[in-house]
Swiss-Prot record:
Entry keyword Magnesium: no
Complex formation: Homodimer.
E.C. code: 5.4.99.12
Reactions catalysed according to its record: uridine(38/39/40) in tRNA = pseudouridine(38/39/40) in tRNA
Species for this entry: Bacteroides thetaiotaomicron (strain ATCC 29148 / DSM 2079 / JCM 5827 / CCUG 10774 / NCTC 10582 / VPI-5482 / E50)
Protein's UniProt keywords contain Protease: no
Keywords in alphabetical order: Isomerase, tRNA processing
Name under which the protein is recorded: tRNA pseudouridine synthase A
Residue numbers annotated as active site: D52
InterPro entries: PsdUridine_synth_cat_dom_sf, PsdUridine_synth_TruA, PsdUridine_synth_TruA_a/b_dom, PsdUridine_synth_TruA_C, TruA/RsuA/RluB/E/F_N
List of residues binding substrate: Y110
Length: 269
């Protein structure tokens, strides 16, 4: 059995998230239908993570299996013909048979976009905030995330996860180049909990508005209680932008780094 990674992007506006839902469309379902149509059999697709409803991805990774060796360029081309306009496949890449899109991922990176400007053409991809925010104070609070590994306070309640332990390696607010009214929160970790990034952003916004001190943000983490954290920021401004893997999971002929050939310069949307 051969295993393949699919590198794709999607606009999550019209989807109830990545994962198949009983009463709503999902990115996973669309991808499975396209693959099943092309390969003429039922195909299961496993993603690197589960983005929530309305959340986007400029780079998601998923895997599927097939008995025969496939021409990966042809697979990518056929999928792009079958998929709706808001889902695009960058590349299909053969990996080792035991490689896993979710469990072998070593890091994931998300970006969240906040703007003070009213602009109709990016309203689906920015969270508009009112009034000024203290981004220096927000970054000071964000740096405290590196001191902790239990993020129960930022996890969705009543989920089936076995642990709320995550290792955050980057968390920073920066002004978006070319857009003086837009700031971007970039966060990288080995794994993320359900709703975690949006909960962190929502709580950091309270710091930026002066409603919560940096020490108060620290206490929110330490209390390990979701009710103590801020309201989750809307999903429409959140993007999954990268998923990282060890090189040894790739077959010998595909060991070149994929990102340099997939993403636009800067790797942002």
């Amino acid at each position: 059995m051969q295993r393949y990674f699919i590198y794709l992007a999607y606009d999550g506006t019209n989807y109830h998230g990545w994962q198949i839902q009983p009463n709503g469309s999902s990115v996973q379902e669309c991808l499975m239908k396209a693959l099943s149509t092309f390969l003429r059999r039922d195909v299961e697709v496993i993603g690197a993570g589960r983005t929530d409803a309305g959340v986007h991805a400029s780079l998601m990774v998923a895997h599927f299996d097939h008995e025969d060796v496939l021409d990966t360029v042809t697979v990518a081309d056929k999928l792009n013909r079958l998929l709706p306009p808001d889902i695009s496949v960058y590349r299909v890449r053969q990996v080792k048979p035991d490689a896993h899109a979710r469990f072998d991922a070593t890091a994931r990176t998300y970006k969240y976009y906040v703007t003070t400007a009213k602009y109709p053409f990016n309203r689906q991809y920015r969270y508009r905030v009112y009034g000024s925010l203290d981004y220096e104070r927000m970054n000071e609070a964000a740096r405290t995330l590196f001191e902790y590994i239990d993020f129960t306070s930022f996890s969705k309640l009543h989920t089936d996860v076995k642990t709320n332990i995550c290792h955050i390696s980057h968390a920073e607010w920066t002004k978006m180049e070319g857009e003086d009214t837009t700031w971007v929160f970039t966060i990288r970790a080995d794994r993320f909990l359900r709703n975690m990034v949006r909960a962190i952003v929502g709580t950091l916004l309270e710091v930026g508005r002066g409603k919560l001190t940096v020490e108060g943000f620290r206490k929110v983490i330490e209390q390990q209680d979701r009710c103590k954290a801020g309201t989750s920021a809307p999903g429409n401004a959140l993007f999954l932008v990268n998923v990282e893997y060890p090189e040894d999971i790739f077959s010998e002929e595909t060991k070149k780094s994929v990102l340099s050939t997939l993403l636009p310069e800067g790797g942002e949307c």
